[in-house]
Swiss-Prot record:
Gene: htpX
Protein name per its UniProtKB record: Protease HtpX
Organism, as annotated: Buchnera aphidicola subsp. Schizaphis graminum (strain Sg)
Record text on cofactor binding: Binds 1 zinc ion per subunit.
Family of this protein: Belongs to the peptidase M48B family.
Biological process annotations from GO: proteolysis
UniProt-listed Pfam families: Peptidase_M48 (PF01435)
UniProt cofactor(s): Zn(2+)
GO molecular function: metalloendopeptidase activity; zinc ion binding
Positions in coiled-coil regions: none
UniProt xrefs under PANTHER family: PROTEASE HTPX
EC number: 3.4.24.-
Catalytic EC class: hydrolase
Length: 292
């Protein structure tokens, strides 16, 4: 995934944009410390931008509707449940949104644990029992209280930094080797373009490989959020909710937010790139109290 993660499209766009800037300005030829600083600046920019804009992006992607005042009994129950769980987790109550979707799903996002958003699909409200929905909400509240969105940003930023840094070190060596026999005065532009092509190619390749790290973290935070939900509302409720997800439609949420959903795309053709563990593994972990 994220698919290759809530972040990857923005991160990739930012990295490629800055790759062009660095190649044109010649920053790649500066000291290794300067390159590391610039790599850190550019590497974290995409992640931080994604985090800051996460609520806006999420609401736009699912066409969510913020619930400020309940219009029916279900919305009243939803607000009360989230308020009570927020108090137990000692966080400010997140904004609440409902979005139209056939699949049973929910997600949490936001730049700060006390300024978060929890969105619930209509499929969840229509197909889950109240106790199951309560467990899913507790799972999302746990993501918020654990600061998973912030941690994910830091992980992605560090990964991006090393992807840019290592790509440019290798690109500098390769482009120098390939252009060593050229006329220095006539081939400067070609050398710069060659460096840009090599570094861009390596950033894409290393970026995909580095997503294994972010996806590993994403899978483990799901286990811990399940365990935290079980502690908050009871293990049986969380297991029942996960079993209910087995009958859900394939998640329709966009790739930019699927990593933050309770019901993710765990059936990736390569498990290393999956943002969520399989439902069977999550249920077994709860039964074994592995992360509790």
């Amino acid at each position: 995934m994220i698919r290759i993660i809530l972040f990857l499209l923005t991160n990739l766009a930012v990295m490629l944009t800055f790759s062009l800037i660095l190649a044109v300005t010649g920053i790649q030829s500066e000291s290794i410390y300067g390159l590391l600083i610039m790599s850190s600046l550019f590497g974290f920019s995409g992640s931080i931008l994604s985090l800051i804009m996460s609520k806006w992006i999420a609401l736009r992607s699912v066409n969510g509707r913020i619930i400020n005042h309940p219009s029916n009994e279900t919305e009243s129950w939803l607000i009360d449940t989230i308020r009570q769980q927020s108090i137990k987790k000692n966080i400010i109550m997140p904004q609440i949104a409902i979005y139209e979707a056939a699949d049973i799903n929910a997600f949490a996002t936001g730049a700060r644990r006390n300024a978060a958003l929890i969105a619930i699909s209509t499929g969840l409200l229509e197909n889950m029992t109240r106790s199951e929905a309560e467990a899913v909400i507790a799972h999302e509240i746990s993501h918020v209280s654990n600061g998973d969105m912030i941690t994910m940003t830091l992980v992605q930023g560090v990964v991006n930094t090393f992807v840019i840094f290592i790509s440019r070190i290798i690109s500098q060596a390769l482009s120098s080797l390939l252009s060593s026999n050229r006329n220095e005065n006539s081939e400067d532009e070609k050398d710069s373009f060659l460096f840009f092509l090599i570094s861009t190619f390596l950033e894409i390749i290393f970026g995909v490989l580095a997503s294994i790290i972010t996806m590993w973290f994403s899978r483990h935070r799901e286990f811990y959020a399940d365990a935290s939900s079980a502690k908050l509302v009871g293990k049986e409720k969380m297991i029942s909710a996960l079993n209910r997800l087995k009958s859900s439609h394939e998640p329709q949420e966009s790739d930019s937010i699927i990593a933050f959903c309770i019901n993710g795309k765990s059936n990736s053709f390569i498990e290393l790139f999956a943002s969520h563990p399989s439902l069977e593994k999550r249920i077994q972990a709860l039964k074994n109290k592995k992360y509790m």
